[in-house]
Amino acid sequence: MKFKLFLGSSFFGVATLLIACGTGRFDQIDDGKIKLAVVTSPSAASSLQTLLDQYNNTKAPADYPVEVVSLDSTGSYTKGKFDTQKRLAAKDKNNFYNLTFNYPDLVSSLAINGMELNLDGVNVSNFEQSFLDFNKNISGVRKPGIYALPATMSGEVLVLNGPVLHYILNSAKKKDGTESKIKTAQLKTASTQAEVKGTMTMASDEQTTKLWTNIQNAAKENAANGTTEKAEKTVSASSLQLKNTNKTTEGTLKIGTDDNTKNLWKKIEDAAKTNGEKGNEKQEATQSNASASLVKLDQKNTSQDKTQNTQTSDDEIKKSWGEYKEVEGGLKGYEFKADVFESWEKLNDFAVRVAKSFSKVSEEKKSGSDIQGVFGIGSLENALYTASFAAGGGDYNNFLFNIKKGRADFSNFFNHNSKTFQSLRDIFNSFKPLIDQKGLISNKHFDTPVNNYAKFHQLAFYVSSTARFPYSFAKDNVKRLIIGKRELEVNPKSMFAIKKENGNNGNSNLLGKVALDNNKSIELYENNIPNGKTDAILIKNQTLISALKNPKQTKSSQRSSQSTNTQNDAICYLAFNSKIRPDDKDIFLLDKFGEKFVTAIVNFEEKTEVKINTLQEKEAVVLPAPQKFKPTDPKSVALVQGPSLIGIHANANEDRSTIKFLNWYLNAEVDWKDGEKKTPAEYLAEKASYLLPFKKVLEKSKQNIKATSKEGEQNQGKKGDGAQNQGKKGDGAQNGKNDKAKHNGFCRYCRQPIFKRFCR
């Protein structure tokens, strides 16, 4: 059953290739304009509108102007595809469009109906050819050619939650005897405390060392976000007294001694240290004299300071992740190396070991604020495609499907003796133990993107599109609504609280009122809306009406070492975001308000998260997503994705004008207001922070990578300490802010094609 679930989720994208039925080619009416369909609101497409204004003001008089048509304001490419298929089935000659942004499988639907537009008349020489080759693998296309342009692309990255991973590894790691003085004082005071010595080790290679350094830095950064309420947790008498009753498991995990592992471990440590710094600063004003003397003693040594900072972070993470357990098949005796993150097989094995070592991961009943797993995958289908393609040696003949004679051929998948099927079985067997341990989550089966859970330390690491990376970090004192097993982050710009009304202003139908951020308010009514009222919504669902009339007492809390719970006077939240899935129990979809979908949320617990309980950008360690299934696979596979610009046949005149516009879009050198000359395609990609796979962009990225490598070598030669210099010159997780504007295309730090704003 789990195999079917895994495959069913992963094959959703493939299945869409096969569902369209042809109705035959037809001509649209010639209305003298080119319509470009998008799945965003007009306001969100402001950069695109600026681009079109530039074209319309400078085009030849005989060429048709281009205008934007909004199909869906929520960014749903699925809804955009359904709209296109609906118009194809109806042979809509009057209200169709000429261009649209969507995924290439939409070309299959167009081709089945003979409505694909061959773009061979467009000069595509600026593109790196390999990024156009996907056109050869679109099913249903009869004549080879260019039908979709990869104008808006993103990649995938692996994001490590530095503070969480530091707590996991530090708990399991075999100690080397260099305990901090504070820790020593704690152990002396807690004389009855039982210990179990650990056996996990860190590899000593350079890659692992750098990674561990980054993880340590993330823990430091996390500790820096502590508040005064955490002052007593490290050295106060009450804390020590509490610890007398607990057993401390000291792990046996080994950190690899290779350079890569050393560097990674340093990054992880730094993340934990940063997480603990502010907490320790705040301690000085509130701790007892005895505790203060311990801190003063410890401050004589900088390295001991850093140890305390990571301990502060670890103590906070421990509250949600629980005690480390030294168990067989877990991290007991395990050697941690940085290359564990380079292949799916080794990454899954590591995640299983973590899940077995922390019992909270495998708990049956979880709320939206509990630990959700170890490993999150934003797109299961992308993980399956990448792992399968790598396992097949990067050969389409060994892939899940191939395109033969314009059709998707799945014969390899159904042949149990094929390399494809054997590889797929190995891939599933790699994921199955993690599924069994409840250590894997994905966007497909949860109502919350995986990066949102990592944002609140509920995951250790995750793979996600770079498109979501800018939304992976929490703001100060962020609020969340916990609704059963679900959690929703409160966006103050689109979610507004409704408080219980003391009176109904003489109207018995008034259920509540919400104030928006633009000095307007919206009133909720049952039965009917009074005449003349425009800023109002009619509530029809009787369950919601009952919840608003008789609200349950909701709670408001702040998660910290001294959590407080108070009664919350908010009885409902209105969310102007249709991506929140309704359940007609606690979350209800209302009528549209203007052009916006509105969702009502009741029966929630409101939580305020302080910084030490959230992931900040400096605390993330960013790596390429796994590019192999097994370490021995001959080729590395990096997935790039995103909607393409697709042409749709209309009529001879409009088709001709469409080709002219696309040639301008890809090749014209335009002077923009920022004073830089670039093509419209480059302008839009930069404004929207997408990867544009132009040759010159990729070449510039390669040069930046070479320059960065030389820079790092020089720094190591000058100082003799790559870990220290990493934070100054070559460490994307810690620095790079001054270089932000220099890089486009591939990230100089993680070597992946990504959003420009992701390069820090």
Swiss-Prot record:
InterPro entries: Lipoprotein_10_C, Mycoplasma_lipoprotein_cen_dom. A lipid is attached at C21 (S-diacylglycerol cysteine). Keywords: Cell membrane, Lipoprotein, Membrane, Palmitate, Signal. Residues 272-284, 705-721 have a biased composition (Basic and acidic residues). Transmembrane segments: none annotated. Residues 300-312 have a biased composition (Polar residues). Residues 1-20 form the signal peptide. One of its GO terms (cellular component) is plasma membrane. The keyword Disulfide bond does not apply. Residues 221-243, 272-315, 705-741 are annotated as: Disordered. A lipid is attached at C21 (N-palmitoyl cysteine). It comes from the Bacteria. It is found in: Cell membrane. It is a lipid-anchor. Belongs to the MG185/MG260 family. This is Uncharacterized lipoprotein MPN_199.
